[in-house]
Amino acid sequence: MHLQRALVVLALLNFATVSLSMSTCTTLDFDHIKRKRVEAIRGQILSKLRLTSPPDPSMLANIPTQVLDLYNSTRELLEEVHGERGDDCTQENTESEYYAKEIYKFDMIQGLEEHNDLAVCPKGITSKIFRFNVSSVEKNETNLFRAEFRVLRMPNPSSKRSEQRIELFQILQPDEHIAKQRYIDGKNLPTRGAAEWLSFDVTDTVREWLLRRESNLGLEISIHCPCHTFQPNGDILENIQEVMEIKFKGVDSEDDPGRGDLGRLKKKKEHSPHLILMMIPPDRLDNPGLGAQRKKRALDTNYCFRNLEENCCVRPLYIDFRQDLGWKWVHEPKGYYANFCSGPCPYLRSADTTHSSVLGLYNTLNPEASASPCCVPQDLEPLTILYYVGRTAKVEQLSNMVVKSCKCS
């Protein structure tokens, strides 16, 4: 008897599925959502910085050039990283992801340019060496979250080839029993195209440097196979030696600014090869990682901002730090698109709602609970901010601050 009643209830729920095709989470109006989102962002930023209240705004009129340069480099790096990983369906959801990261920039140690060149072959340069001093953060080895090596590729109009493969290596201590290099990454690059920043993930390498200072012998960018040129079929062309035709800003002689030209010297330093380190301050990390979640692709800004989609989608929301939050202590950016998710969620039996009938029955028996699908964020991106605590400038990365896509869940 009880089984028959259950079957009747399930049948009625299936029949009602079409009429109950909208989520119960769709009754909120946009103004209400915006107010809630603004307040959530206020608390989120303070929480990620481990601040109990907003710091007093700085009276400094001008931001130091090196601080602004660090902010711009970090922002550009994050844009590149998330652009390259747009197809990655996984996202870490750990405590280390949550809290803000302190940003450090280390420029390449400048020296005589010939010290940056390696001539494995007798007729030309095949490698470039990049050295860095990261000893100032050695005590924070366990707090390293990410490290990126960035170098600006410049066009080479006199190049004999249109494309060349380069490979990045960690230089190891000389030992007859092990290799002298450790491969990190490789890229196929145009030699004459417009200038572009190249980024390489060197987290493991820098972590080793922080752990053992003597292991920091620098990085090497080399052509794929020094001293040889290959035919399209893979055969080696004897007696034709390949040399590096990729040019890098800050390491090639063409960049010599001349004596006394402070403006060009400053520009060269801004564009010189450098490391960007993201460190988690010890006071912001109390617990071990909280695990990872696999996420599926959702409706993103590319679709939602171009279409008048009424169902669940990401909606644009610009937050002005001064006008919306009443904050003067954040110097850069002045505001950003935080965005939010809103819209009805289809309440139909599908791959994502296989148990919709069971959820419906649960809703009937538990009217106060919410088992209906809601429009929620799926993919989020970080935000880089420049702010002052007293007279000390800080550049930090705040994770998961920009909603890029949504899903029904």
UniProtKB/Swiss-Prot annotation:
GO cellular-component term (any): extracellular matrix
Q: Which Pfam families match?
A: TGF_beta, TGFb_propeptide
This entry's Gene Ontology molecular function terms read: cytokine activity; growth factor activity; identical protein binding; transforming growth factor beta binding; type I transforming growth factor beta receptor binding; type II transforming growth factor beta receptor binding; type III transforming growth factor beta receptor binding
Cell attachment site (motif): residue ranges: 259-261
What are the annotated glycosylation sites? 72, 133, 140
Record GO biological process: cell-cell junction organization; detection of hypoxia; face morphogenesis; negative regulation of cell population proliferation; negative regulation of macrophage cytokine production; positive regulation of cell division; positive regulation of cell population proliferation; positive regulation of collagen biosynthetic process
Stretches assigned to coiled coil? none
Per the UniProt entry, the signal peptide is 1-21
Q: List the disulfide bonds.
A: 304-313, 312-375, 341-406, 345-408
Highest taxon, organism lineage: Eukaryota
**Key words, A-Z:** Cleavage on pair of basic residues, Disulfide bond, Extracellular matrix, Glycoprotein, Growth factor, Mitogen, Secreted, Signal
| PTM note | Transforming growth factor beta-3 proprotein: The precursor proprotein is cleaved in the Golgi apparatus to form Transforming growth factor beta-3 (TGF-beta-3) and Latency-associated peptide (LAP) chains, which remain non-covalently linked, rendering TGF-beta-3 inactive.
InterPro entries documented for this protein: Cystine-knot_cytokine, TGF-b_C, TGF-b_propeptide, TGF-beta, TGF-beta-rel, TGFB3, TGFb_CS
The UniProt entry's sequence similarity note says: Belongs to the TGF-beta family.
How does this chain assemble?
Interacts with ASPN. Latency-associated peptide: Homodimer; disulfide-linked. Latency-associated peptide: Interacts with Transforming growth factor beta-3 (TGF-beta-3) chain; interaction is non-covalent and maintains (TGF-beta-3) in a latent state. Latency-associated peptide: Interacts with LRRC32/GARP; leading to regulate activation of TGF-beta-3 and promote epithelial fusion during palate development. Latency-associated peptide: Interacts (via cell attachment site) with integrins, leading to release of the active TGF-beta-3. Transforming growth factor beta-3: Homodimer; disulfide-linked.
Give the protein's function. Transforming growth factor beta-3 proprotein: Precursor of the Latency-associated peptide (LAP) and Transforming growth factor beta-3 (TGF-beta-3) chains, which constitute the regulatory and active subunit of TGF-beta-3, respectively.
Q: Which protein, by its recorded name, is this?
A: Transforming growth factor beta-3 proprotein
Q: Which gene encodes it?
A: TGFB3
